[in-house]
């Protein structure tokens, strides 16, 4: 409020002088009216801000730092991500750090470890982390013999919280992040683990749609710090030294990678949201709530496990009610049972409130993004389910840039061509009474899905 007083100093002085001329019998009500006027002005001032500046302010209050010197290159499909990342690793000179939920024991992981082994021979330090539950739940896990072979090639690889009997207590607080940092100069993050189904698809769901991004700029250091903190937690080893952190500009050896061709390349505002179960457990949930509540015109949302909690449902309904165009895209296919029934139940309810819902048909859309007012977006590992919002280690890049946001919005528009729009008619044709009942039952279990 002090800033408001300073910006309206002459008017405020006039109000104060008037107050002292006011009869004592009416002075209390006069003060109340003045306070109400100031509060209204403050709210108007906040509303006049763009949703992008508001979200930055809100995230800074939660401890997120933003920098303005970043480039962000979107890697829209699996082939593009792995081609770009593998080429970057081939040019590594100092260190390669990888943190994934899982490395599926298939052709892509095999190629990755071969490339990493070659870099080790050239003196590059390679450190890799994977989650025990992610590996345990994988239909092609890394077995002890595989891990032994990888280590024999000089790659330091460790498992976070291996699953041991009784395993039921070990399903929470897992490391679901996907981070790669190369030479402390460039970083990758997004929704993909290391698996060939991001390229080949699977028999169960068909094509597997997902995306990643490459970051160059100050936020590479943030991602490096996240990795090194987890490395110490898992191994007990503290890694320090300037060589692990970025000194701009990006070395010429990485010029062969796909460039950020937008007008704001090298000038993008980016912040990294890092969710840790015991220190920042509500940060991603609060980001989504604030992003939805701050929206003034348009929300586009893609998420594979759209089970939501009550507050997120309420926020989306309120956004629709105040005239925000809300577009949601979810997949017809899924890799797990019951959860999609809950997802379909939720989007149908939101469709009836006025949301525009698209059901993606060709395969499984595993992407986790939101675009707000054409001004900011996020790419990362967090789903909109209980696991990501309440329990697991997660990480999302918040990109405050209209150009990158438009790139994602354009992708959303293209994906509409492979989707059908949910209406009451298409809902009744698609979902049998039994499936509707299963969806209702599944939504009761959403705190556990």
Region locations from a protein language model:
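Bacterial Sec-dependent N-terminal signal peptides
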Residues: 1-51
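Charged, low-complexity intrinsically disordered terminal segments
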Residues: 8, 41, 45-449
């Amino acid at each position: 409020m002090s800033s408001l007083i300073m910006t309206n100093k002459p008017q405020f002085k006039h109000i104060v002088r008037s107050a002292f001329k006011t009869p004592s019998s009416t002075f209390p009500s006069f003060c109340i009216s003045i306070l109400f006027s100031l509060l209204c002005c403050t709210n108007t001032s906040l509303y006049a801000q763009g949703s992008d500046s508001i979200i930055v302010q809100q995230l800074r209050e939660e401890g997120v730092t933003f920098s303005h010197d970043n480039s962000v290159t979107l890697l829209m499909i699996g082939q593009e991500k792995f081609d770009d990342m593998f080429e970057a690793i081939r040019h590594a000179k100092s260190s390669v750090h990888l943190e994934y939920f899982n490395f599926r024991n298939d052709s892509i992981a095999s190629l990755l470890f071969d490339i990493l082994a070659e870099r080790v021979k050239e003196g590059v330090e390679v450190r890799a982390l994977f989650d025990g539950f992610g590996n345990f739940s994988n239909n092609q896990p890394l077995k002890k013999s595989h891990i032994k072979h990888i280590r024999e090639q000089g790659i330091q690889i460790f498992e976070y919280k291996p699953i041991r009997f009784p395993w039921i207590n070990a399903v929470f607080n897992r490391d679901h992040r996907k981070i790669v940092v190369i030479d402390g100069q460039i970083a990758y993050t997004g929704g993909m683990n290391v698996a060939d189904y991001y390229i080949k698809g699977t028999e169960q769901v068909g094509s597997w749609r997902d995306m990643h991004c490459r970051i160059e700029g100050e936020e590479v250091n943030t991602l490096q710090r996240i990795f090194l903190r987890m490395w110490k937690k898992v191994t007990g080893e503290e890694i320090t030294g300037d060589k692990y952190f970025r000194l701009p500009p990006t070395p010429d050896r990485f010029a062969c990678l796909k460039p950020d061709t937008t007008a704001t390349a090298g000038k993008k505002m980016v912040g990294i949201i890092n969710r840790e179960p015991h220190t920042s457990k509500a940060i991603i949930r609060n980001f989504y709530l604030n992003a939805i509540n701050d929206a003034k015109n348009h929300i586009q949302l893609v998420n594979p496990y759209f089970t939501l909690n009550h507050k997120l449902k309420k926020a989306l309904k309120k956004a629709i009610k105040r005239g925000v165009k809300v577009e949601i895209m979810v997949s017809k296919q899924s890799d797990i049972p019951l959860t999609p029934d809950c997802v379909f139940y939720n989007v149908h309810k939101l469709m009836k409130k006025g949301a525009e819902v698209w059901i993606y048909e060709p395969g499984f859309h595993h992407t986790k993004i939101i675009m707000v007012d054409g001004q900011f977006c996020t790419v990362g590992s967090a789903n909109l389910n209980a696991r990501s919002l309440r329990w697991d280690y997660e990480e999302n890049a918040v990109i405050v840039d209209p150009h990158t946001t438009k790139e994602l919005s354009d992708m959303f528009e293209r994906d509409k061509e492979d989707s059908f729009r949910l209406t009451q008619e298409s809902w009744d044709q698609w979902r049998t009474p039994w499936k509707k009942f299963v969806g209702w039952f599944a939504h009761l279990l959403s705190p556990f899905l």
